[in-house]
Amino acid sequence: MRLMHLGKESHWIWDDTTPGMHEGDLFIATNGSGQIGHITYVVEQAKKAGATVAVVTGSPKQTCPQMADFTLFVPAAVFNGTDDRAVPSIQPMGNLFEQHLYMLFDIIIMMLEEKMQVSHEEMEKRHRNIE
């Protein structure tokens, strides 16, 4: 969503209006445990289509992250995953990992906003206006 607000063409993979993936496209996936079946399958399909794949994970040694062109390791406790470097949490399941994702992607958007010289006002103009 925020990539679109920055003026980039972006789509959510599960939306029926998402176009086909091709060489030159970037597919970004999050897979905390690195072994979520449907995410691993979609990453495999993106690779077959020629897309560049980036996976954000808490378990970089698992199958899905190993298939990626780029892997970003978030050292936080994940649901059904293990990594000796993960920060433990008293929170249930993958909450810590998910919270880190929100912060990580927010920081990435702010960095892109600065690099692309896009203002908050420009981004707001691209926000839907029918809610």
Which functions belong to the PLM regions below?
Residues 1-103, 109-110:
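Glycine-rich phosphate-binding loops that contact phosphosugars or nucleotide phosphates
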Residues 107, 113-131:
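A short, charged, Gly/Pro-tolerant segment at domain boundaries
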